[in-house]
């Protein structure tokens, strides 16, 4: 791995994730399990560690116990040469209050910046699914001479109204930063595409510190990185865009190169899982040259008995399928599917139990959900709406530990 001692990583992991309820009823959004073996935060941490950035502070707040534990247990570094990945809860250094926004989270944690004294700071979000080599973005930032560089992903202009949008000139300088505009701007080379902000930033340290301090004195500010800090630096002529399509990740296939998903809603979370299950997946979990690291448990291998069958599915360790059928689904560890049961197009998190003859379709079942014998989920949505959360796209979501 490449060592970058002059770079400090700050991961913003305090998100509440209300639109992912009930998956966020008992945990922070970055701690939500994903992909059968990971949590959402594992993607950004894997990208940073794979790039050689080994001084990382993860700023946490909302229901952070499971997230703090996951970071402490899964992401231990040796401590050699000052390497660390450490969760940092709200420290209330500026009075008895929690973070009021992502910029305020950094303000309250500036002691970490002063202690490390980095030349550059990468500030990344913790709840997106993607692969990226951050070092390439840092090098682009250094060469551009900008105070801040914002990662932008090209999305069709007709869909860009749902994102923070970047209007840039041909040199890459950002001239406007627009939050969910009705009429998104095109890119300099393609009027039909728009740069959407990925929520990933590289700052020259002094620029970030000065901007954070100035924002803290603005009583009209929401103290948000994307809503306040970046627009202020755009207005000051300090901001440039980094085109995500230029980021080349080792081992990436033509099919999954440039993949990035905001999984902030139940439908988006579900769709991102369905991206994993095909023979040639849109997002490939099996890239050994740029691995996604997750929690490792001492579990037995998955087991299929009495004709148990899984097709186009991801099946985690410790799962047992007994005379059951699973199709187009993602099963996390220790899931048991009993005889005659059918699971189709679903996401089952660790410890889920599916009883004999049960049917589960287009559903997300959180940890330790138990579906009784003969139960049917995802077939009659009107009935399901009386019992569970059902997304706009018709995905049934059942919270942790529910017995049905």
From Swiss-Prot:
GO terms, molecular function: ATP binding; glucose-1-phosphate adenylyltransferase activity
Enzyme Commission code: 2.7.7.27
Residues given in the record as alpha-D-glucose 1-phosphate binding sites: 99, 164, 179-180, 197
CDD domains given in the database record: ADP_Glucose_PP (cd02508), LbH_G1P_AT_C (cd04651)
Metabolic or biological pathway: Glycan biosynthesis; glycogen biosynthesis
Major enzyme class: transferase
InterPro entries, per the entry: ADP-Glc_PPase, ADP_Glu_pyroP_CS, GlgC_bac, GlmU/GlgC-like_hexapep, NTP_transferase_dom, Nucleotide-diphossugar_trans, Trimer_LpxA-like_sf
Pfam families xref list: Hexapep_GlmU, NTP_transferase
Keywords: ATP-binding, Carbohydrate metabolism, Glycogen biosynthesis, Glycogen metabolism, Nucleotide-binding, Nucleotidyltransferase, Transferase
Gene Ontology terms describing biological process: glycogen biosynthetic process
The protein's role, per its UniProt record: Involved in the biosynthesis of ADP-glucose, a building block required for the elongation reactions to produce glycogen. Catalyzes the reaction between ATP and alpha-D-glucose 1-phosphate (G1P) to produce pyrophosphate and ADP-Glc.
Family membership: Belongs to the bacterial/plant glucose-1-phosphate adenylyltransferase family.
NCBIfam families named in the record: glgC, PRK00725.1, PRK00844.1
Protein name per the record: Glucose-1-phosphate adenylyltransferase
Upper lineage: Bacteria, Bacillati, Actinomycetota, Actinomycetes, Mycobacteriales
Gene that this polypeptide is encoded by: glgC
């Amino acid at each position: 791995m490449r060592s970058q001692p002059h770079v400090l990583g700050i991961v913003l992991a305090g998100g509440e994730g209300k639109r992912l309820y009930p998956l966020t009823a008992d945990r922070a959004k970055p701690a939500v399990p994903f992909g059968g073996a990971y949590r959402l935060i594992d993607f950004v941490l894997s990208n940073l560690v794979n790039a050689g950035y080994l001084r990382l502070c993860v700023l946490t707040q909302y229901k952070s116990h499971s997230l703090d534990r996951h970071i402490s247990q899964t992401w231990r570094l040796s401590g050699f040469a000052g390497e660390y990945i450490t969760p940092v809860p709200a420290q209330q250094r500026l009075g008895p209050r929690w973070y009021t926004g992502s910029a305020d989270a950094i303000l309250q944690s500036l002691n970490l910046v002063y202690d490390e004294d980095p030349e550059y700071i990468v500030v990344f979000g913790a709840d997106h699914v993607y692969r990226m080599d951050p070092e390439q973005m840092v090098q682009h930032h250094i060469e551009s001479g900008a105070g801040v560089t914002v990662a932008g992903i090209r999305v069709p202009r007709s869909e860009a109204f749902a994102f923070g949008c970047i209007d840039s000139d041909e040199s890459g300088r950002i001239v406007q930063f627009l939050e969910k505009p009705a009429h998104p701007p095109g890119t300099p080379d393609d009027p039909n595409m728009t740069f959407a902000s990925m929520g990933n930033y590289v700052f020259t340290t002094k620029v970030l510190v000065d901007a954070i301090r100035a924002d803290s004195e603005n009583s009209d500010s929401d103290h948000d990185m994307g809503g306040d800090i970046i627009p202020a630096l755009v207005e000051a002529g300090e901001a440039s865009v980094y085109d995500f399509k230029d980021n080349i990740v080792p081992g990436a296939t033509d099919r999954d190169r440039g993949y990035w998903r905001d999984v902030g809603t139940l439908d988006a979370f579900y769709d991102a899982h369905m991206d994993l299950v095909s023979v040639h997946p849109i997002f490939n979990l099996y890239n050994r040259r740029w691995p996604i690291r997750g929690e490792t448990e001492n579990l037995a291998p998955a087991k299929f008995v009495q004709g148990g069958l899984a097709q186009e599915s991801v099946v985690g360790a410790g799962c047992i399928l007994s005379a059951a059928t699973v199709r187009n689904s993602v099963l996390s560890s220790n899931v048991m599917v009993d005889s005659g049961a059918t699971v189709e197009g679903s996401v089952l998190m660790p410890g889920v139990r599916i009883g004999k003859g049960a049917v589960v379709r287009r559903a997300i079942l959180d940890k330790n959900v138990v579906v009784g014998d003969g139960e049917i989920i995802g077939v009659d949505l009107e009935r399901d709406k009386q019992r569970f959360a059902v997304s706009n796209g018709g995905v049934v979501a059942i919270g942790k530990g529910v017995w049905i």
